[in-house]
Amino acid sequence: PLFADFAEDKHTHDLNTEFLFGKSILVAPVLDPQYTDGKGADVKIDFSRNKSIKVYLPSGCEWYDFWTNEKISGGKSVNKETPIDIMPIYIKAGSILPIGPKVQYAKEKKDAPLEIRIYPGKNATFTLYEDEGDNYNYEKGNYSTIDFKWDDSTSTLSIGQRNGNFNGMLKKRTFKVVLASTESGIG
């Protein structure tokens, strides 16, 4: 529940339609049928008409709409359009979010550049963790980490050295750094 992370915001105390995924990603799933009658009846569905839901963004920080990168102040509700292929997702300002390529299975494009998306507004840190992905060798120390640090006052991202190793590890990891803004693309 949101109140665990935003106890000072009384609007989150009884809010049970949203949740945080990790410390940075606010998810507001569509819980009621919007494109069907909800009873399984065979009805004509008009996918061209966008529906919307109200999403509360907790106070104490700013938020970015994941799909548009629009920056929004917290402490208020916003109406978010919910076409059939969009779930309302918001990212807390001061977050670093890794985004991998679209794949059909986990190791399909393991050497593709990894997008590191910066959501400015506060200083941020993030540790990228990688391992073999298909066994328990990480319990024996077979994994690697790379630390990222965003300094918001200077708009500087520092990327640390890789620590550790594992079988099949890429010799060279390529990053595409993206500063979230309405000009930098969406989702």
Show the residue positions of the predicted features.
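Catalytic core of carbohydrate-active enzymes
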Residues: 1-156, 165-186
